[in-house]
Amino acid sequence: MGGNLVLKLAGELGASAPRQLRSVVGVSPAIDLGLSAAALHLPQNRLYERRFLRNLIRRFRRKVRLFPRAFDPNRATGIRSLREFDDRITALYSGFASAEDYYFRAAAARVIDRIAVPTLILHALDDPFVHITPETLAKIEANPHITLLQSAHGGHCAFLAKSDPTAGDEGYWAETTLLRFVFAHC
């Protein structure tokens, strides 16, 4: 979610971004939140969804213990999908009308065309959770401030390459690429 958040902030700031914000990087960002939530619910991704959901429910229960008057512990009972969690908990406690409202309003896709600082997005075409809609892709490609690097493989955040010890490259393609980008814009 961090990639979506930083891209959304950059889009909301647009041309008014402070000069200290020199560049932005998103690695496998869930730019279209609803699409990512739907992808997590696919049978082949249910293991990941269950893990994310278990962690979210654990965090929610911790908040209930810390702030018992602010949160209803029964809201988490029987939740079986990320979308259901977002509908019953995230939306309710974050001021959204529903999960769909949350996915729309919290998505970087809505404002990505307004990004006005050098931005790098790394995305793997075989990412099982993060898919970019054609409409969002068109916005990204039309924005001269955004560099989109898409690899055929990499899944969700597993961008590796052949290492080159003589060049100090250990095969961490994403890390090497984003550092070069950030240092080029310092």
Region spans (language model):
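Short conserved micro-motifs at the rims of enzyme active sites and ligand-binding pockets
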Residues: 36-37, 132-133, 159-163
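Short beta-strand/loop motif that positions the catalytic acidic residue
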Residues: 115, 121-123, 127
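Catalytic active-site module of serine/aspartate enzymes centered on a nucleophile-bearing elbow/loop
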Residues: 152-186
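Active-site nucleophile elbow and catalytic-triad environment of alpha/beta-hydrolase enzymes
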Residues: 88-111
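Short, conserved loop/helix-junction motifs that constitute active-site signature segments
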Residues: 18-19, 112-116, 139-143
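Hydrophobic/aromatic beta-strand patches that form the interior of the parallel beta-sheet core
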Residues: 25-27, 120-122, 149
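Alpha/beta-hydrolase-fold enzymes
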Residues: 1-92
